[in-house]
């Protein structure tokens, strides 16, 4: 079983020079405002590190967290950074600030070679939003051979059983499912342990 031995906040940045040095593999968490990024990060890491803004789209910083993962069964201990990007879709900012903000994020994703995994959170109740399609296309256009893109559906526990089953069968692969109530799900759906194992695999291996 994978245990998160340490998870702590590193820094926030709004410009590339403010980002911490790229000393370890990193995963990026992105998604629309109110998609549940903070809940996912806190559940994944077992600690309330990521904060939700009361105003959707208000947070315009990339937040960096250092995490240490341990898998005793396989004698593995590794450190990774988690990068929490601002939610997109609701930002009520001036055009000039929005352009500067998007420019920083695009540059961050383009040039930071330590990023190995992009995790795109999508609301399971709204699968065909244009903003999510555009985000997926833009990220996939950036991917290098040593990087991977993964969809992860949030709000899964808000669906009825038939909707859950259809999503599980029909969603484009690869994908994962997240809920803050993992234990309430049927055993046929991924558990928190499976989510952690999957992410660890992507962070440790070259997907090409």
Swiss-Prot record:
Residues covered by the EngB-type G domain: 23-205
Q: What is any one of the record's Gene Ontology cellular component terms?
A: cytosol
> Which residues take part in binding GTP?
31-38, 57-61, 84-87, 154-157, 182-184
Q: Which cofactor does it need?
A: Mg(2+)
Please name the CDD domains in this protein's record. YihA_EngB
Q: Which NCBIfam families match?
A: GTPase_YsxC
Q: Could you identify this protein by its name? A: Probable GTP-binding protein EngB
Q: Supply the source organism for this entry.
A: Helicobacter pylori (strain P12)
């Amino acid at each position: 079983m994978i245990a998160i031995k340490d998870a702590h906040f590193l820094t926030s940045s709004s410009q590339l020079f403010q980002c911490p040095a790229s000393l370890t593999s990193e995963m990026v968490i992105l998604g629309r405002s109110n998609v549940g990024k903070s809940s996912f990060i806190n559940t994944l890491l077992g600690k309330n590190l990521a904060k939700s803004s009361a105003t959707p789209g208000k947070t315009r910083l990339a937040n960096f967290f250092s995490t240490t993962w341990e898998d005793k069964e396989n004698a593995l201990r590794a450190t990774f950074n988690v990068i929490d990007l601002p939610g997109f879709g609701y930002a009520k900012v001036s055009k000039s600030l929005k352009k500067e903000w998007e420019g920083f994020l695009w540059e961050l994703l383009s040039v930071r070679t330590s990023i190995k995994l992009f995790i795109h959170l999508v609301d399971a109740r709204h699968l065909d939003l244009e903003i999510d399609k555009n985000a997926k296309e833009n990220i996939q256009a950036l991917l290098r051979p040593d990087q991977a893109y993964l969809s992860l559906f949030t709000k899964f526990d808000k669906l009825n059983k038939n909707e859950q089953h259809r999503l599980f069968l029909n969603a484009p692969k690869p994908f994962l499912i997240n809920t803050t109530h993992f234990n309430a799900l049927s055993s046929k759906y991924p558990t928190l342990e499976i989510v952690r194992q999957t992410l660890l695999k992507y962070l440790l291996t070259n997907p090409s």
